[in-house]
Structure formats: C-alpha cells, structure tokens
Amino acid sequence: MKHLKTLTVMIFLLSVPALASAFGPHDGLSCTGCHAIHTAKGELIFAVEPNKKAINPRTKTPYTGITALCLGCHETPENGGMGMAPVSSLHSHPFGLTPNPKRATVPDSVLRDGKLECVGCHDPHPSNPNFKYLRVDTEKGSKMQNFCGMCHTSKVDPSSLKDIRIFNSMDERR
C-alpha cells in the first residue's frame, strides 16, 4: 500500500509540469485578468497600469499606447513591469515605432495608429490558437516564414504567403 501511495504521488508530481505547459500563458485568465470596468488603472478598461518607465531604445522615449499596456506585465520589475514573461526590446522585433517602408511593407491591418505595436503581431486572447499568440499560424513555430513574410515579403518564398490569414479575436463572423 505504501508503494502505491508513493507511485501515485510520483505520477502526480511528474504530470504537473506537462499539464502546465499544455496551456498558453493567458489561458488561465478570464476577461477580468486583463480587463477591468470599474477598477480600471488608466483611461482604458485594463486591470494593469500602462508601463511608464520602460524606454524605447530606438527613440529614447517611454513607450505609449497599447505597447505600454503590454509592458505593464511583460517587462522586468526594474523597468516598470510585473516580470511576467518579460520581452527585451533590445532582442525582440522592434515595437512602438512607425515602420520603415524601405525595410518592410507592413499591412494596415497590423498597424495601430500607423505604428507597429505588440498587438500588431500578437493577439493575446485565449481564443487565439496560434504559437506565442501570433496573429498568423506558424504551425507551432515551424513555419515562421508565414509570419515574417507578412511584412518582409522579399525575404520569403512568395508561394508560402498565398494562404496567410491574420487572426483577429474580435472578428465575430467566425
């Protein structure tokens, strides 16, 4: 009987990490994990305060808009965030900027007020089935050219772009 209990505990302990990784980081959140109507932390209905401390290394100014909101969670505490899967603006695709047309042809559907923001590439809602909440299916990261090719068309095989669909969780026509 003692061996059965030990075996049961071991199976449970070994399965917990697998279960935790089966879901995306936002999957355990309800709408109120990010959105707050009566207790909003800023002018928008979000439960988190926009990050006013993180500095865009390319412009040397604080991030604004939706990117500042994303960085409220996804930046290190010393840079004004909550430290949840922090992104590095030095080792990430540039964000919080107006795209350079000499480097990329960015579709209007991924721009916010003419800028490349976090939500241009990511849709963080749990209904998004894509790898890393990207707005384009990359088959779990194995076909990143589908994603990069949205804007950097000269860097990919054009035939790989013919079936690209940009995910939008707010599209209720599905």
Where are the language model's segments positioned?
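Short, linear, compositionally biased motifs with a strong N-terminal bias
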Residues: M10-L13
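Flexible linker/context regions in extracytoplasmic redox proteins
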Residues: S21-D113, V119-R174
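Bacterial N-terminal signal peptides that target proteins for export
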Residues: M1-T8
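N-terminal signal peptide c-region/cleavage motif recognized by signal peptidases
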Residues: S15-L19
